């Protein structure tokens, strides 16, 4: 079986940070949801965010989008609050946990929503990019399907194509701008093959200079695909480092309240986590 080639670094790569979070705090009605969150993401890095349900993972991502506030977050070297929404949307895209649609849009029209930040009017190039994005997620030929007739997993892949179209690199540009992709549980509705296809695609984007932050629940997917793992517990960062450094029995049991065994994967260069109870 083919071995996965993955960077193994204990610290972030040395390039300029795409995302910097410093002492981020967030409370609602006196309840502390995030406390002193600090980390950074650099170009070409895939950072997996792990934690129990309610640990603060999605709240953290909603801060990175600016939905819950813009303090404590810098992107591309500037405070988040200094960006116009349209300017930021051309360089940072987010795929939330759920994107419910109640209207019978054609699939291609949904993907074309990702091109809105790039111009007021739809162009033939936009449609070409949208079709290419659908092909990247395995949905070529779905362009004129009613999205409400698709399975949950297929709909999730349509929205993944939408954010791909949003960040699509211009092949004519002499230099590609730095970009960030935020994924909140991107594999939650997917079968095994498409879970791996989605994260392989994320890794491919990393080779193109995109920084990816992905909230995941599957520890083994994080072990296989992430450069670094950030564990959130009770709204705090309790561990941050390579999968080998972070995904240990002691750290996992403390974060998730479940005993595990960790062994070298028999086929891949990464840890393998199995339940021990």
Curated annotation (Swiss-Prot):
Record bears the keyword Nucleotide-binding: yes
Q: Which GO terms describe its molecular function?
A: ATP binding; ATP hydrolysis activity
Origin superkingdom: Bacteria
Q: Which UniProt keywords apply?
A: ATP-binding, Cell membrane, Membrane, Nucleotide-binding, Translocase, Transport
Entry coiled-coil feature ranges = none
Leader peptide range in chain numbering: none
What role does this protein play? Part of the ABC transporter complex HmuTUV involved in hemin import. Responsible for energy coupling to the transport system.
- Family of the protein in this entry: Belongs to the ABC transporter superfamily. Heme (hemin) importer (TC 3.A.1.14.5) family.
The protein's name in its UniProt record: Hemin import ATP-binding protein HmuV
What gene name is given for the protein in this entry? hmuV
